[in-house]
Amino acid sequence: MLERDGPQQWPLPEGASTGAVRLYTDGVFPTDDGRARFSAADYRPVAEPRDAQYPFALTTGRLRDQWHGMSRTGTLGRLFGHVAEPVVELNPLDVERLGLQDGALVQVSSRRGRVVLPLQASDTVAPAQAWIPMHWGEEVLGGTDAQGQPLHGVNGVTLPVVCPTSKQPELKHAAVRIEPAALPWRMLGLAWLPQEQALRTREALRALMPAFGYALVLPFGREPHADGLVGLLWRAAAPAPADEALVRQVEALLGLAGGDALVYRDRRRGQYRAVRLQTQGADRLLRGVLLAGDTQAESWIRTLLQDERPAQAYGRALLAGGATPPVAVAARGKQICTCFNVTEPDIVQTLARCSGGADARLAQLQGALKCGTNCGSCLPVLRGLVRTSMSAAAVTSPAATMPS
C-alpha cells in the first residue's frame, strides 16, 4: 500500500482502506471496560530552575528532517539541506542585551558541561530561553575549552534527572549561561569526495577536533550524486592561528595536497587558502576548498562548490579573500522540500504566477514543482509561503497567473 498510495495516516487497522484521522471518536478506549482512564498527576516544577548564575532556560527538540542521534539520517547530505549546521537560538532581545550578533560563536554552559555553537536570533524563542536541536551530539561537534576540558554535544549540557513515574530523562530543560567564545581564528573546509573516502575523512577529522576550541564535521549534498560523490563540511575555530602542520593535515584529508591544487599561504598572519578544480566536459568544477584565517569568502565560494557551478572564469581569484566575489554568484537559496530538492526562490517565483485561494495556489505550486507531495514535512512552510505571496499580491499590481 505504501508503495502504491504513498504515506498513510496511523493507525491503519487491518482491512481498512484509509487511516483514522482522529482516535477514539466512538468513545471506546483500549481498556477492559472500554472507558478512558485519567491520572491526576501533581504539578512538579523543573528539576533545575534558572538563577543568576545560569539565567537561561535551555530547551531541546527535533529538526524536521533528522531523527534522534542521527545515526542513520546524519549520513545523508540531502537531509542537511533544511538545517545545514547546528546553532543555538535566542530571542533577539537577549541577543541585543548580550551585545552579540547573528553567527557569533558562543559558549553554552551548564553545571555539567559546555558546548560551543554559532548564535542565531529567532522570534520563535521566548526571552530568557535558548533552543538547541537534540541531534547535535559528539558525532558532529567537538573541541576543547580554555581549561583543556573537552566540549560536548548538547546532551553533555542537559540534565540526567529522570521522571519518577515514566523514568524519562529531563532532557527538555536545563539552566544555562551563554557568553561569547573568544575564538577569532576560523577554518572552513568543503570537499566533494568518493563515498568511502568521505567516511574515512569524516572520522579522521573528528579525531582532530580536540586541537580546536570549536569544531564540527557534517555531510552535505544530494544522494545519489551523478558522480557518486559525497559532500563534506569541516568547520573549526581557535583562540590563535593553528600550527601550519595541522592546517596541512586538514588540507590533505580534504584532497587539497596534490599538484592540482591552487594554494595561498601567509604563515605570519595565519592565513591559508587552497582550492581544487576538476574538469567535467567544458567546465571546471570546484571540488575542494580550504579557508583558514580569513573565511569571509565562504559567502560566495561555498555556493560555487555546493551548487557545482562552473568555476573556470575565476582562475586564481578563487584564492582571493574577502566577502565580495570576483564574479557575481547567485545562490540557489534555502532548501524547503528535501524530497524533490526545491528551494525557497523556486517556490516564491512559482507562487507569483499562481492565482485563487490558498488551497488553489498550493495545488498549483505542487503541480508545478512537486514540493510537499511526498513525505509532507514541508507543507507547513509551503502554506506559510502561500500566505505571504497572497499578502504581497494584495498590495502590488497583478502579475501573469497560472490557471487554477
Please provide the spans of the model-predicted regions.
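Cysteine/selenocysteine-centered motifs that mediate thiol-based redox chemistry or coordinate metal-sulfur cofactors
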Residues: 147-178, 312-345
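C-terminal catalytic lobe of FAD-dependent flavoproteins
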Residues: 215-318
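Long, contiguous, secondary-structure-rich segments that constitute the structural scaffold
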Residues: 1, 73-89, 93-256
